[in-house]
Amino acid sequence: MLNKKKKILIAGLGNANVTADSLGPKVVNNLYITRHLQKEGIASYQFELSAIAPGVMAQTGIETSEILESLAERIKPDVVIVIDALAARSYSRLNKTIQISDTGIAPGSGVGNHRNEITQHTIGVPVLAIGVPTVISVPAIIHDVFGEKSLENVSENIDEEFISMHVTPKNIDESMKRISYTISEGINHLLHN
């Protein structure tokens, strides 16, 4: 998908102030951005890379999909790459799996905070999504440990607030540094070497 694409916009989704949700902004902070260098004639690169960490709707009052649609109309990228933290369905994938999709993403859907989807249909250009599961729900943990039958039995006896809770490992700070660096360096190497 990237071999013929020259103008790339990367969007680091998530809340930079919440460690488990800060993957996107952390990746953006480590990228080697080149759009401004090419526009000013300072340097020439195979790819024109621009990036944004748009925050979350609670910070901006604007759907991230609206921000990206407006940016795509203005700077006309050939492809948008979105990077976001995800919710795991299994503890074995927590902070260990990097998922890549060419169908876009629905931010917040893993934790029940459904936002407008970010897809080629909504943005107007192809969308690649890169995500890492950084949180897991209590029901997913119960299912991992005890199986489906126990999940049904336990769910009946647990407070609704507890069932809707998402948790993250205690080493999330270190994991986030490592994962965000791995993704950003992978992108930097792919686009600039």
Whereabouts are the PLM-identified features?
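Extended, charged alpha/beta regions that create polyanion-binding interfaces
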Residues: M1-I8
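Glycine-rich phosphate/diphosphate-binding loop of Rossmann-like nucleotide-binding domains
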Residues: A11, N15-F47, A51
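A structural-propensity feature for long, helix-poor, extended segments
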Residues: Y45-L71, K76
